[in-house]
Structures are given as C-alpha cells and as structure tokens.
Amino acid sequence: MAKATDVRPKITLACVECKERNYITRKNRRNDPDRIELKKFCPRDGRHTIHRETR
C-alpha cells in the first residue's frame, strides 16, 4: 500500500470548464507543493483546456 506521505502521489486532473476527470498522473510534492494546472486535451469539449489537480 502507498504511504500517505508518499513523495510522488497519484493525482487526478479535472477539466476546469466541464469538471470531468480526464487524466491520472503523478507529481513530486517537493517540487510542486501547490495544486498543479496543466493545459491538456479535453475529449468532452474537443479542445485543449486547463486541467487542475483534484483531491
């Protein structure tokens, strides 16, 4: 099982516009302590939108 204080936890990225959770990725907590935002393709909207980390 993964520890709660894992350095590279799995995070879910949700589209800002349609709120759909499209991507699962990992991040390094030491380099990015805040929530990350990435511009990714949203299949529901059919275009590139900002995806924000969800908890």
From Swiss-Prot:
InterPro entries: Ribosomal_bL33, Ribosomal_bL33_CS, Ribosomal_bL33_sf, Ribosomal_zn-bd. GO terms for biological process: translation. Keywords: Ribonucleoprotein, Ribosomal protein. One of its GO terms (cellular component) is cytoplasm. Signal peptide: none annotated. GO terms for molecular function: structural constituent of ribosome. PROSITE patterns: RIBOSOMAL_L33 (PS00582). Gene3D superfamilies: Ribosomal protein L33. It comes from the Bacteria. Pfam families: Ribosomal_L33 (PF00471). NCBIfam families: PRK00504.1, PRK00595.1, rpmG_bact. Belongs to the bacterial ribosomal protein bL33 family. This is Large ribosomal subunit protein bL33B. It comes from Salinispora arenicola (strain CNS-205).
